[in-house]
Amino acid sequence: MNRIPIHTLLWLVTMLFLSGGWSTAQHSNLPICTAQNEQLFPDIVSDGNRGAIIAWMDARNGNRDVFIQRIDAKGKTLWKEDGIAICQLPGSQGWPILIPVSDNNGTIFVWRDSRNGNPDLYAQRIDINGTELWEKNGIPICQNLASQDDPKAIADGEDGVIVVWEDWRNNRQDLFAQRVNGKGEAIWSKDGVAVYDGAGDQYDPSLTTDQTGGAIFAWWDISTPEWRVFSQRISADGRKLWPERGLTVCEANGNQGGPSVISDGSSGAFIVWSDYRNDPAIFTTSDLYAQRINANGQRLWNPDGIVICDQMENQQQPFITHVNHGIGGIVITWWDDRDVFSDIYAQWINGDGEPMWALNGLPICIAEGEQRQPKLIRDKSDGTIIYWLDYRGDYGNKATSAIYAQRIDKNGRSLWALNGMPICLADGGQMTPDAIMTDNIALIAWSDGRNGDSYDIDIYADLILLNSKITE
């Protein structure tokens, strides 16, 4: 295999900004919504045509509503200026989630809604022209009189969606889920089926496809003396396929929490979590562990999980993606306190549970100051783009973050500038970035405080045009 010099590798991927709305001037970016008051928590999904659809929570009318916008591959907004309102009923609507549909004709939009007083969950389908296809103001996912919180959603593979949430109908925090088809019809029981409704409280549900119309779920549970991570598989018709009270993901002593789950491509899943088995106090120093579970609910790796990182100090907020379309294992990124201030690290774990990069992870960004909330997307060339909030040079004087990103190849080599390249350095700070790949374009959206008013946050976006292939 021919290898080219590292200085050449650094030029293999050139960041190009397209014409027609996307500016190369630092701090400009593309305004998606600059309406009055705050716009928060953008979620982005491919429109199937090299562009993107972006949704957000919006307070322009005083209370919080949900809005949506579409942009093309040149950064041109295609719908109404400052977005289309999806729901503006009394009460609060927020926490938007967008799910792609297989025919590339728009998206399914899920949100949390208090129109009835207590928080419920609703959904709407939007076509490529911004037209609502289901009932005006959305169809109910769950309207139980108790509260429904922290929704997560995935595509069901058949133009529908599966949603999971935390639910208080039993006077404790349980987990329920619902499947809705492409026509907006609930397939499972009214107000959802129980993923787990036993003793104690369950937190932070995560889900992934089982590739047969159902889903695999992961969560952490405080009903046991030590907090545990559990998993469950529910079939396309809403039946539990694993133990009634869930499968124990890790049997090690100590507490576990904050799991993330992703398909293994064989109707099973990879699960990553924060692990406190080596914590000398309580929830002060977390390690990161992982497990693979097959379609039958059997653990394939060590019953205690395999180590991603067990450095001294604290590792948190793991975020995962596949290595490639053939799965190939998972790439994990996290923030890491091993060097006083938190930095960004990453690791590739193959399908057999073996770390493929440096022990305890590769440094992605070790710049001065804090780096937090890393996320990542696969770049379709067996590489990965990692992006994060960055406080380099800010040791608490401003407490405002920029957004940086790094691209790494499958060997873990950084392809962009040391410690990442800036996506946005505008004054006022950036929050909650979310990104997707569409062909060879990375699209990223975020909430932005550049206008200087902490109560008037806007939505901005930018793109990076990548070369189509990383050379070995």
Give residue ranges: language-model regions.
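Bacterial N-terminal signal peptides
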Residues: 9-20
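Extracellular, repeat-based ectodomains that mediate carbohydrate processing or recognition
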Residues: 22-472
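Bacterial N-terminal signal peptides that target proteins for export
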Residues: 1-10
